[in-house]
From Swiss-Prot:
Cleaved signal peptide residues: none
Tissue expr: Widely expressed throughout embryonic development and into adulthood.
Pfam families linked: Bromodomain (PF00439), PHD_2 (PF13831), zf-HC5HC2H_2 (PF13832)
Domain of life, source organism: Eukaryota
Protein name as catalogued: Protein lin-49
Source organism of the structure: Caenorhabditis elegans
Basic and acidic residues bias (residue ranges): 735-745
Length: 1042
């Protein structure tokens, strides 16, 4: 009988006379104890029929039945052992017989669960191992014994017998300590350990029923499903190659590679599991255990004419079976393993009906690499590193101890046992350490069970080695802690640098000189001079005769550097003079006159905003309260126009964004890191209501960052001077000049980016600044901080003096009156005054808006002034477009602006971007803009199928959408938003009608692509539903009812 079934008493089945007693004991919980003995009572009269015996049995009472069926229990549960009668007989230490399954249907009640009674197999194995010998001699052993016995006979020594040799080799195999070869984990360039990947699928993901297992000999790592190991065996686990041919090298019949996961075709041939999967003719007969490879001969015959283009050894190019490039009419062929080792693009796609399609492309026809392809290439390199380790001989020799040899001598004494031990060791060495007993399970016997790791280390390694290992581990830990401390120091210094830059920019706001502002204006004027007409002086013959006062942008830059411009109005006069000279000299030349008019139109808003900034700064300098708070380091809100630029108001992303989270992004203040005062909500709301144009409730912790462009605002071209700056070409040019200025020693951005903003935001900001001039009340976003009030000294606030290391308690407060009363040329000039009022040099005259190092916004900005957002992405179906509801924020701006618990965090400035990166960001911003503004009835492509967008509020206009469909639509939308709460979902209707479940679907914008019917002929793949989409679009254009 099999394992766990016990030994049968007789050939006939013994009848169980009691089942109700077992049910009672099962309900009482006594079956948790181990049944040691069970006496089976058989009927005295075997001639009675089954029906008669059943009637007799049912007439017997329960107590009478229990007396006929005797059981002795050995309790293992302490709770149940208290309920057992003390009159039970002591457990009998013998094993007679047991019943695994009761005789159902013959007598008694059928049991739902019958406890299994098993032998103590461990004891039986130990007693058998003490006497039984599993090893049998082979021809090689007999040859060695015949040679050795001939020599020992001449010397008169004891000869070897087969029984002695088998006994000694058997005990040596079972008692030796055998440890598989240790393999260290792979590490990356930073020294971090990498997880192994499956040798077949190159995937490191695992699950509870599909783990990555390792061969104990060659350390081959494979998935259970990939290699066909449904159940992980106990003890030693070996791959098929190590189990059958551990010493000999095996070759794949389909490719020249000698490493990897092999399966056996027959007694002499082997194949890779990967080759069987990729070659169309071959497959596994048993897909669970991945065995019984079929059609190998057919594959070799059909593909004998193909040769590998990637084989380094050209002699192996014609061997095996090659696969071909998936590109049509391409005849390139290569082995499966050669293709993967060379990094070719190999993809496996599974359709909905379960069909698997495999594609591989040669280097000439390789498609663009995706993120999955790049990740697969990295995993392939990691697997190649592990393959190189397995190319060497996997020798793992066993270890013997003197106590083991003494035990064998007692069992089977022999005078010259050292010869047997040497021959056994050489035989194991010839097999690369593979055991001689194949069917002996590791750990089945206590005598052969592997010792614990601590015991092995204590027996096999000396004390010096252990001490050295401890020292190495200590050094490793100290290096790891040092690296962590270094990272913390770097982060701390970066925060310090960011804080210092924010304080510097804050002071530049209040004390920026007019000369520096003029330099910024001139740099911006240079950027809009695309033709370089006004960049250099005119050197034409007769130019000075016509023009009395020639001037150009280069002359203006020199005058600004020498400080000749005291006001922006003087600079504006020179610009007007330059444009009038151009019109005078080029009279009759339409090209230059048109260029001059365009330049005048673009430069006028720039000069007007610069003049207003100058006026606003002068107004702020005369504000005693503002200047007092600024000098003492109190973080006050500055509503200047420069702060409201689009690049300043954009959200700065966190340095390490987390994927897959549904929380909204935090809008962070790039200027300040302030812990605001706890003010009353009613006061905040009343203060906010005083700000012109503020209709939304804002957070108290937002500070000055609430100035932003609304989601539904349009970017309109500038038509007059009051419309601020809408000349969007300056934005891109300012970015380029910003990148150039970053090479200087100042850690701030270009001056040109300090006063570029959207028209709407600049108007709002001008309205806010008017309060400082006395016309309106100043905004009360923060509680007033008075230096006269002693209670304010206990409030938490971030001061500049704290950052520079001085004690705020002992520091003397600087007032605006003291600053103005102190002579500028006195010797005891205040330190803060010297650091604030010194005019920076020209080389360091970068803009204070370097914090605005921008990131691309989903609300893309037009590049040409005459193009607005409304027609920037106009497609073929633009005649039926209608905007999405403005209540749903999309993209970066969809964030919780009223979150009271968020803290303002200073982020480091983003990295410097090249011109190519800027262009890529513009394109990406345009794509995001297109994806975030899908209109009702917009033609799109979703997963390769033609569809149209259905806006939820306009779904009733579609004739084919009934009330139940709209209810289902909103229900599915809630389900999708629960999974992807941050993404904007779009409801689409597919034109290809397959069934009712697939006609309508909620999708995310990243899966949607705009369908342009004008250029659809250039698309090579076929789009399902395209014909129906064209017909529907034509009906819309004709005004028909759809």
């Amino acid at each position: 009988m099999g394992r766990g079934r016990g030994v049968a008493i007789q050939e006939t089945i013994e009848e169980c006379r009691d089942t109700i007693s077992d049910r009672i004991q099962y309900n009482l919980g006594l079956n948790e104890s181990k049944v040691v003995l069970m006496d089976i009572v058989t009927g005295p009269n075997q001639n009675v029929s089954l029906q008669e015996r059943t009637k007799r049995w049912m007439a017997v009472s329960v107590d009478a039945r229990m007396t006929k069926f005797k059981k002795n229990f050995y309790p293992t549960n302490q709770k149940n052992s208290k309920n057992i009668s003390k009159d039970l007989d002591p457990p009998i230490q013998r094993v007679d017989a047991h019943i695994v399954t009761p005789v159902a249907g013959k007598c008694g009640m059928p049991l739902q669960k019958f406890p299994e009674f098993k032998h103590d197999h461990e004891k039986i194995k130990i007693e058998r191992d003490a006497k039984y010998v599993d090893y049998s001699v082979d021809e090689f052993d007999m040859s060695w014994m015949s040679i050795m016995n001939a020599k020992r006979t001449k010397l008169g020594l004891e000869i070897f017998s087969v029984a002695i040799y088998e006994h000694w080799v058997d005990r040596l195999e079972k008692m030796c300590i055998w440890k598989p070869k240790e393999f260290h984990k792979l590490k990356d360039e930073n020294g971090e350990e990498l997880d192994d990947v499956c040798n077949i699928c190159l995937d490191g993901d695992t699950s509870n029923c599909n783990q990555i297992v390792y061969c104990d000999r060659c350390n081959l790592s494979v998935h259970q499903d990939c290699y066909g190991i449904p159940f992980i065996p106990e003890g030693c686990l070996e791959c098929r190659r190590c189990g059958i041919s551990p010493a000999g090298r095996v070759n794949c019949v389909l490719c020249p590679s000698t490493t990897g996961a092999f399966k056996q075709v027959d007694q002499k041939r082997w194949v890779h599991v990967l080759c069987v999967i990729w070659v169309d003719e071959t497959h596994f007969g048993n897909t669970i255990f991945m065995e019984n490879v079929q059609n190998v001969e057919k594959a070799l015959h059909d593909r004998r004419a193909l040769s590998c283009l990637l084989c380094k050894n050209r002699q192996n190019a014609r061997m095996g079976a090659c696969i071909q490039c998936s590109e049509t009419k391409c005849t390139a062929s290569f082995h499966v393993t050669c293709a993967r080792d060379s990094g070719l693009v190999m993809r496996i796609n599974e359709t909905e009906d379960g069909q698997v399609n495999r594609f591989v492309w040669c280097p000439k026809h390789a498609p663009p690499l995706t993120d999955a392809d790049r990740e697969m290439r990295q995993l392939m390199l990691r697997n190649a590193r592990r393959e190189n380790e397995r190319k060497g001989p996997m020798i793992s020799m066993p270890t013997l101890m003197k106590s083991m040899i003494s035990t064998i001598c007692v069992e089977r004494p022999f005078s010259d046992y050292s010869e047997i031990i040497y021959f056994w060791y050489e035989k194991r060495l010839n097999r690369l350490g593979a055991p001689l007993l194949k069917n002996f399970t590791q750990g089945a016997s206590k005598s052969r069970r592997l010792l614990p790791k601590s015991t092995i280390c204590g027996q096999l390694k000396n004390v010096e080695t252990c001490e050295m290992k401890k020292q190495v581990n200590a050094v490793k830990e100290s290096l790891a802690s040092g690296l962590e401390i270094f990272d913390m120091i770097v982060r701390r210094e970066e925060r310090k640098k960011d804080m210092l830059n924010s304080y510097i920019r804050m002071f530049e706001r209040g004390f920026k000189p007019t000369e520096l502002l003029c330099q910024e204006v001139i740099e911006a004027l240079k950027t809009i001079d695309a033709g370089k007409v006004f960049a250099e002086p005119v050197e034409l013959v007769g130019y000075t005769d016509i023009i009395e006062n020639p001037i150009c942008l280069k002359d203006m830059s020199e005058k600004a550097a020498s400080g000749k411009y005291s006001t922006v109005a003087a600079l504006s006069a020179d610009v007007q003079l330059m444009l009038s000279n151009c019109a005078t000299f080029n009279k009759g030349n339409r090209v230059y006159i048109k260029y001059g008019n365009t330049y005048r139109k673009d430069s006028t808003p720039i000069l007007e905003i610069a003049e207003k900034e100058e006026v606003e700064r002068l107004a702020l300098k005369t504000d005693e309260k503002f200047m007092t708070q600024l000098l003492n380091g109190v973080m006050v809100e500055y509503n200047g126009w420069a702060q409201s630029r689009n690049e300043v108001a954009k959200e700065i992303p966190p340095p390490t964004p987390s994927r897959g989270r549904g929380t909204g992004r935090r809008r962070q203040n790039p200027f300040l890191d302030v812990q605001e005062l706890d003010t009353d909500d009613s006061k905040d709301s009343s203060a906010l209501s005083e700000i012109p144009g503020s209709s939304k409730k804002s957070s108290r912790k937002r500070g000055i960052q609430d100035t932003k462009m609304e989601e539904d605002e349009e970017i309109k071209p500038s038509t007059s001077g009051t419309n601020a700056v809408a000349s969007v070409p300056l934005l891109s040019s300012s970015r380029e000049s910003k990148n150039k200025s970053k090479s200087s020693d100042a850690d701030v951005s270009s001056p040109k980016s300090s006063w570029l903003g959207s028209p709407s935001t600049s108007q709002n900001l001008r309205r806010r600044v008017q309060g400082f001039s006395g016309n309106e009340s100043s905004p009360k976003v923060h509680k007033k901080l008075s230096t006269d009030n002693p209670s304010n000294s206990n409030l938490r606030q971030t001061t500049l003096t704290n950052f520079f290391g001085t004690n705020p308690k002992t520091q003397q407060q600087v007032t605006f009156a003291d600053m103005t009363a102190t002579p500028s040329g006195s010797g005891n000039k205040n330190v803060s005054q010297r650091s604030l009022f010194d005019t920076p040099s020209t080389s360091k005259a970068s803009s204070f808006t370097s914090l605005s190092s921008t990131r691309p916004s989903t609300r893309s900005t037009s590049i040409i002034p005459t193009i607005n957002k409304k027609n920037a992405f106009r497609m073929s179906s633009a005649s039926i477009q209608s905007p999405l509801p403005t209540t749903k924020k999309i993209g970066v701006r969809a964030m919780a602006t009223d979150d009271e618990e968020e803290d303002i965090v200073i982020q480091p400035p983003p990295k410097e971007m090249t011109t190519q990166e800027l262009e890529a960001e513009k394109l990406k911003s345009a794509e995001n803009e297109a994806m975030s503004k899908f209109a009702h009835n917009q033609l799109v492509i979703v997963d390769g199928r033609a569809a149209k967008v259905i806006e939820s509020r306009l779904a009733h206009l579609a004739s084919d959408i009934h009330h139940e469909q709209r209810q289902s639509m909103m229900k599915k939308r809630r389900e999708v938003l629960s999974e992807i709460p941050q993404a904007a979902v779009i409801y689409v209707e597919f034109f290809q009608k397959s069934n009712t479940l697939e006609n309508f679907q909620w999708v995310t914008p990243d899966k949607v692509e705009l369908l342009d019917l004008n250029n659809i002929g250039q698309r090579s793949p076929k789009i399902p539903g395209l014909k129906a989409a064209k017909e529907w679009h034509q009906k819309v254009l004709n005004g028909e009812d759809v």
